[in-house]
């Protein structure tokens, strides 16, 4: 964890020294008041209640507590939608953009592929530690092909779309890679799976993740007006964040049940 400190410090210094964004007119207080605090709080409560319900479902506590948390998640989500559609002047999730087919599909794709990717990143080391009995270094090393594939395929897919002028085939291929990569992990066996098979199956989910994020962002930018690029991109990042959170919070229950 300490290795991240100098990297984050270098990133902070670089942004502080090089990034120059013209400031808009108005005081700091006026800019802070523009933030959708109500929507943010409602979304936070909904996600926290959902995570609590999943955590209680894994424990031996009363089932009523699980249902109460789920009800709280539904209520929080309902309040969030109401605030975004009826109250917020600058909503966290602009519903008029999300109501269109392309932004909605892009947001859903980003959320689902993030769920899959972060589920893999969270549980693959846990599998090698708990099931295979490897060291922490070996368990973490198995993630290297996934991360490298995500970075490389993100760049390659962007170049491919730039040369061909079409993103449909690349999006379909990215989704196929993600599905095949996740399915190949289902055939891992403690004694029967050789080491080379782990290395061979690890990159594909990362490859699909990296290329999907890049290509869908291009598709989104081309489908909205220039003035809507920022809020539309914000919606996709919201779904990506929620997908990554659910990937790390929902999948542990399935993982624990499979080990049991």
Residue ranges and their predicted role:
Residues 1-38:
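Helix-loop-helix hairpins in multi-pass membrane proteins, especially solute transporters
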Residues 5-12, 77, 151, 179-180:
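Small-residue-rich packing faces within the transmembrane alpha-helices of Major Facilitator Superfamily
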Residues 48, 155-159, 245, 249:
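Residue-level hotspots within transmembrane alpha-helices of multi-pass secondary transporters
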Residues 10, 217-218, 222, 235-260:
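Hydrophobic transmembrane architecture of multi-pass small-molecule transporters
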Residues 44-66, 80-87:
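Phenylalanine-glycine-rich, low-complexity intrinsically disordered regions
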Residues 3, 31, 35-38, 109, ...:
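Hydrophobic alpha-helical segments of secondary membrane carriers
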Residues 1, 54-57, 128-129, 160-162, ...:
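Interfacial helix-cap and linker-helix signal at transmembrane-aqueous boundaries
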Residues 87-231:
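Transmembrane core module of solute transporters
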């Amino acid at each position: 964890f300490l290795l991240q400190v100098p990297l984050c410090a270098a990133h902070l210094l670089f942004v502080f020294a090089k990034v120059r964004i013209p400031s808009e007119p108005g005081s700091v207080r006026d800019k802070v008041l523009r933030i959708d605090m109500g929507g943010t709080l409602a979304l936070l409560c909904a996600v926290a209640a959902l995570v609590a319900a999943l955590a209680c479902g894994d424990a031996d506590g009363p089932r009523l507590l699980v249902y109460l948390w789920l009800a709280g998640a539904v209520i929080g989500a309902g309040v969030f939608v109401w605030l975004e559609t009826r109250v917020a002047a600058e909503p966290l999730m602009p519903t008029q953009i999300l109501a269109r087919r392309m932004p909605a599909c892009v947001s859903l794709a980003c959320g689902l592929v993030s769920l899959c990717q972060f589920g893999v990143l969270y549980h693959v080391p846990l599998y090698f530690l708990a099931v295979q009995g490897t060291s922490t270094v070996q368990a973490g090393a198995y993630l290297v092909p996934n991360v490298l594939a995500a970075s490389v395929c993100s760049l390659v897919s962007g170049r491919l779309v730039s040369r061909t002028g079409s993103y449909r085939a690349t999006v379909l291929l990215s989704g196929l890679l993600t599905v095949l990569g996740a399915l190949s992990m289902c055939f891992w066996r403690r004694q029967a799976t050789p080491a080379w098979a782990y290395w061979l199956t690890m990159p594909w989910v990362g490859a699909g993740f990296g290329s999907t994020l890049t290509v869908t962002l291009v598709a989104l930018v081309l489908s909205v007006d220039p003035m809507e690029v920022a809020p539309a991109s914000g919606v996709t990042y919201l779904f990506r964040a929620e997908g990554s959170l659910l990937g790390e919070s929902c999948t542990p229950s399935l993982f624990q049940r499979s080990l049991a």
